Regions:
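Transmembrane beta-barrel strand/turn architecture of Gram-negative outer membrane proteins
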Residues: 1-25, 29, 112-132, 211
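Conserved C-terminal beta-signal and adjacent last beta-strands/turns
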Residues: 8-11, 15, 51-57, 199-214, ...
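Membrane-embedded beta-barrel scaffold of Gram-negative outer-membrane proteins
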Residues: 11, 43-178
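Surface-exposed loop and edge beta-strand positions of immunoglobulin-like domains
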Residues: 15, 106-108, 118, 132, ...
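Short acidic-glycine motifs
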Residues: 19-20, 25-41, 137-147, 220, ...
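Short sequence motifs at beta-strands and strand-loop junctions characteristic
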Residues: 97, 104-109, 177, 186-190, ...
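Short, P/G- and charge-enriched loop/turn segments at secondary-structure junctions
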Residues: 101-103, 183, 270
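Gram-negative outer-membrane beta-barrel transporters
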Residues: 120, 126-267, 323-325
Length: 328
């Protein structure tokens, strides 16, 4: 603390932590149609089995009508990254194909740094600010890869053998499986942000407040194209509030406005952009001293349109509520 009245408070912290893979990360085996979601536990790889139909073009090359795949076709074996196969489909250039091998997932580690400042100024303005920076090792999320039903995954297309070319033909025939797998990236991942909160009584018992947060995620996608980071956090959030617990006898109110910028949502179910949202919430309180109770009536997303916070989930609409709290 600093200042004559010790009202300037500074804080700083350094922490280390880790995040273990969840049960789903390790043991899920789910066919989602366009791709299969495979957990990374060693015991799970043989547990997941699916039989895929081979195209007529593939059968004409002499391959069976079906192909059995297991979780081992997704992990610890050469596979193609999904973005590179997409480019190959557009250009026909085999040099666009990128070969990778997915390792089993392991715990993620983080080093977290934070500094902050808090004060109440002589004019009654309360200030709370903080800045943070996180460094991740073995950042844990998912990756999407492709394996052909026949042929081999390889980069030497000039050999006398035809297995590599047959693998390319499998991709061209649509005889390939997309796997979404749980793994770690070896690339550097960091996140940083800041927060600022202000509050002040502006007139009699009216309380005005505002909060802003900035969140930023740094990951070079070009160095690990198939990795899906899934930060899923808006870069900017803003909240403003106005309230008075003593508007007049036994009555109070509070109004909040919340806004966030658009952000990318990435998950095993769906990916997409979540649009920016502005939400207005309001509440009035009425105290009933005779029965030691408080009646609250309010609305969330008042006058607003339905909005989403997660791709693939239902939209959030308006909510009206009322409650009576009794304090005997």
């Amino acid at each position: 603390s600093a200042g004559e009245k010790k009202n300037h408070n500074f804080r700083a912290s350094f922490q280390t932590g880790f995040r273990n893979p969840t049960t789903q990360d390790q043991y899920i085996g789910l066919d989602l149609g366009p791709f299969a979601l495979i957990g990374s536990a060693e015991a799970n790889l043989d547990r997941y089995i699916e039989v895929m139909n081979v195209s007529a073009a593939g059968q004409a090359l002499g391959f069976a009508a079906t192909k059995e795949l297991t979780g081992r076709d997704a992990y610890n074996t050469p596979v193609y990254s999904v973005p590179s196969v997409t480019r190959f489909a557009q250009t026909g250039n085999v040099a666009d194909l990128e070969i990778t091998s997915v390792n089993l997932v392991k715990p993620e580690q983080v080093k977290a740094f934070e500094v902050g400042y808090k004060t109440v100024l002589e004019n009654g303005l309360s200030v709370d600010a903080n800045v943070y920076y996180n460094i991740y090792n073995d950042f844990m999320s998912t990756s999407r890869v492709i394996t052909p039903y026949y042929g081999t995954v390889g980069s030497d297309y000039t050999t006398d053998g035809s297995t590599d070319l047959i693998g390319l033909q499998a991709i061209a025939n649509g005889d390939r499986r997309v796997f979404q797998v749980y793994t770690n990236t070896s690339e550097t991942v960091s996140s940083m942000g800041l927060g600022l909160g202000l509050s002040k009584k502006v007139y009699k018992d009216f309380e005005l407040g505002a909060n802003y947060s900035h969140s930023q995620f740094e990951f070079d996608q070009s160095k690990d194209p198939s990795f899906i980071a899934g930060f899923n956090t808006p870069k900017h959030r803003l909240k403003a509030s106005l309230g008075n617990t003593k508007l007049f006898k036994n009555f109070g109110f509070n109004v909040n406005v919340r806004w966030n910028s658009e952000y990318l949502w990435q998950a095993s179910f769906a990916d997409g952009m979540v649009p920016e949202n502005t939400v207005l919430d309001a509440q009035i309180n009425y105290s009933i001293p005779a029965i030691k109770s408080v009646l609250k009536v309010g609305a969330a997303n008042l006058f607003g349109k339905d909005y989403i916070q997660v791709i693939g989930a239902g939209a959030i609409g308006q909510q009206l509520f009322a409650s009576l709290t009794i304090n005997p």
